Regions:
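Non-catalytic, mobile gating and regulatory segments of ester bond hydrolases
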Residues: 2-475, 479-699
Length: 699
């Protein structure tokens, strides 16, 4: 950080990122140098033979090229290791070494071309077998290196890099002029024109990346509009963020350690009455644990677990196979290509499943926990159009609509379309905003329910069992959770008694007025440090500021910072900035102040910078049950040794305003992990009851 500027343009790589590629090339070229030198010393070359003479001169030339390559690569590695992440002045001379390396590469390619010509013309007739075998191996190896180098250059190419350099040069000249003459020039029109030009270039670049990444999806009008919206969002988010991917990695490593130190300091100081943290959540005397000893709460929690099976079943056969690796053969009898021979009398309507109805088979296997009748299941998927199914749950006497979460590239596009959009209500409420992609998905499902008359069909499914009296329940996980919550709000006027269970919903889902309204009928479930409920656009802007603040505090080279988290499973030496903060409340308080200042600066940038678009905060829906882990200490008396105890607490929507960096931040989002954690909460409560009863009996 910042991005390397060579050849009059910015690149998506930092001057301190060249240590690893430089060391890799150095190792390969050193081995090649040894092989060539050994072949020149050991083998006798009869220069009276033209083919041997040409080979000898080729090897001598390449030995010189390798020598210069090794020298330049040593220089690049040494220079690249200098200074901290932000101290690019210590690496200013890296540009000269890159230009030298580029020149050496040109000589290398020229030599490879001549060597390839020699192979095509003289390889068969050259009477020196061992030397020419080494020669062809070196040729192949170096062509491979050239190909890898070109791929790397293509990956680090910044399409808007030249415009960026011009804009920065202009801003620098403006600041120098203002400083020299001690006045501020009003030249906003020219400045804004340059900024718009850069932003347009970056938006086009992101649009191109989206089209390349999702090239298999076709180029429909809906997809093109989605690409444009996402490109605008991403270019806006990364505006004037002069970082490269490795900076983000180093920032995440530091931020995780800073967050841990901050939590330790809060507990040590008993700030706000906090006496411990569970899964990153501050626990105080006011924390509301779900009282599962109460029969009503216990039954409600069992209902939460019950409907998690519906949310998991919507994922179809991929999730079933992941969860049941040793039992996936159980699906075979349920497949259509086999089941049709057995005279299956299933009258469910299944839309756009695969040829063997694998998804529907997995759904039926997942829902074998009660008396459940599947009425309708669609696996059609497009941008803003999510698969779902409708079922009659005779066990709970409910009509269940379950919506699938993210599973395809089209689902990812729906997720990324994260701008706020007004919910389509009658009468309209301008302050009720929702995640744009999920609003579109909810409208699609609502229209489908109305066009196919699905809710009415489910209510009339079995008059003898009074299905017409059943209430409506909406469930979903991840993308499905967000869509289900918005759909519940849309259907609430027509179905006043409906309920919604939203598992691992996205953080940037609803504006606060809509969240407050939803608390009476939506229950959300979040596991541990799950990142998805914490990554709304507003939270991402805070994360952006926190990463920059963490990087600014770093005094170590980037390679050392990153290696601290990977050497010996994270057992390497701690970064210097972390060591300086450890146990020092003054330094931690200073860090907190700097973090607040960084967030404020991000929200209110200076006039000379490219202002960020401020996004209205969006939050997870409804009342939130947060499943947290308590890792027992060695001196604690626990029921199961070394196993964390899972507990459920009531959380507020505003509690998920910060991304917690953790190895489990992605794992905690998986539906099977959520279901397992919910069951462990009940299991731990049951074990505690059994232990108490045993003690009472013994006494």
């Amino acid at each position: 950080m910042p991005g390397l500027v060579v050849f009059r343009r910015r690149w998506s790589v930092g001057s301190d990122d060249l240590v690893v590629p430089g060391a890799f090339l150095l190792a390969i070229h050193f081995i090649s140098f040894v092989l060539v030198a050994v072949s020149l010393v050991l083998f006798e070359y009869n220069t009276s033979v033209l083919s041997v003479k040409l080979l000898f001169y080729h090897l001598i030339s390449y030995l010189l090229i390798l020598f210069f390559s090794i020298c330049v690569e040593i220089g690049i590695c040494v220079i690249s290791m200098r200074g901290s992440i932000l101290d690019s002045e210590a690496r200013t001379s890296i540009n000269i070494w890159i230009y030298l390396k580029s020149l050496v590469i040109l000589f290398d390619i020229s030599w490879l071309i001549l060597g390839s010509i020699w192979l095509s013309n003289y390889y068969m007739e050259a009477p020196i077998d061992e030397a020419k075998k080494i020669f062809i191996a070196i040729i192949i190896c170096n062509w491979t290196l050239v190909f890898i180098t070109l791929i790397t250059i293509w990956c680090t190419f910044d399409a808007a890099g030249r415009s960026w350099v011009k804009m920065k040069k202009y801003q620098r000249s403006m600041r120098e002029t203002e400083s020299r003459f001690n006045y501020k020039r009003s030249n906003s029109m020219n400045r804004n024109w340059r900024q718009r030009k850069v932003m347009r270039a970056y938006q086009d670049s992101w649009d191109h990346r989206c089209r390349l990444l999702f090239c298999c999806m076709g180029s429909s009008e809906r997809n093109r509009n989605s690409f444009t919206d996402i490109a605008r969002l991403l270019s806006d988010f990364f505006r004037e963020l002069d970082v490269v991917p490795s900076d983000v990695v180093a920032g995440l490593v530091l931020l995780r350690k800073f967050q841990r130190l901050e939590r330790e300091a809060i507990v040590r100081q008993r700030k706000n009455g906090t006496y411990e943290f569970l899964s990153g959540v501050p626990i105080t005397e006011h924390t509301q644990f779900l009282a599962l000893n109460d029969a009503k709460n216990y039954d409600f929690f069992q209902t939460v677990i019950h409907y998690m099976y519906f949310a998991q079943g919507a994922y179809g056969w991929p999730m079933y196979v992941i969860i049941n690796r040793s039992k996936m053969w159980h699906l075979v009898p349920e497949l259509k290509c086999f089941g049709c021979c057995c005279g299956s009398g299933d009258d469910s309507q299944v839309i756009q499943d695969n040829c063997c109805y694998c998804n529907y088979a997995a759904l039926k296997k997942t829902l074998q926990l009660g008396d459940i009748d599947i009425v309708y299941a669609t696996y059609h998927v497009d941008v803003g159009e999510t698969p779902f199914f409708v079922a009659v749950d005779y066990t709970q006497k409910k009509i269940v609509i379950s919506i699938r979460g993210t599973l395809s590239m089209k689902d990812i596009l729906t997720d990324l379309n994260a701008e706020g959009e007004v919910l389509p209500l009658q009468p309209p409420r301008d302050d009720w905003l929702g995640h744009k992609g999920m609003v579109q998905a909810a409208i699609y499902i609502r229209n489908k329910l109305q066009q196919e008359n699905l809710i009415e069909r489910a209510l009339q499914r079995n008059a003898e069992r009074s299905t017409h009296t059943f209430d409506l329940v909406l469930v979903g996980h991840s993308l499905g959770a967000g869509t289900a919550a918005i759909l519940a709000i849309l259907l609430k006027p027509e179905h006043p008694t409906l309920q919604c269970f939203s598992y691992s919903p996205p953080g940037g889902l609803l504006s606060m007025p809509a969240v407050e309204y939803s608390k009476s009928f939506i229950t959300s479930v979040v596991l541990g440090k799950d990142v998805v409920p914490r990554i709304g656009l507003n939270q991402m802007e805070a994360l952006r500021a926190d990463l920059i603040n963490a990087i600014q505090r770093s005094v170590d080279p980037k390679w050392k910072t990153i290696s601290c988290s990977v050497i010996c499973c994270g057992c390497g030496p701690e970064p210097t900035s972390v060591v300086n903060m450890s146990g020092q409340d003054t330094h931690i308080n200073q860090y907190q102040e700097e973090r607040g200042t960084a967030r404020s600066t991000s929200a209110h940038p200076t006039d000379s910078s490219i202002a960020l678009t401020l996004h209205q905060p969006l939050y997870p829906p409804g009342r939130i049950i947060h499943i947290v882990r308590h890792h027992p200490k060695p001196d604690e008396n626990v029921l199961k040794n070394r196993e964390p105890v899972y507990q459920a607490i009531w959380a507020d929507s505003t509690d998920f305003d910060e991304v917690l960096i953790s190895p489990v931040m992605l794992q905690d989002h998986m539906p099977d992990k959520v279901l397992a954690a919910l069951k462990k909460v009940i299991s731990d409560v049951d074990d505690e009851r059994t232990s108490v009863n045993s003690c009472s009996t013994a006494s």
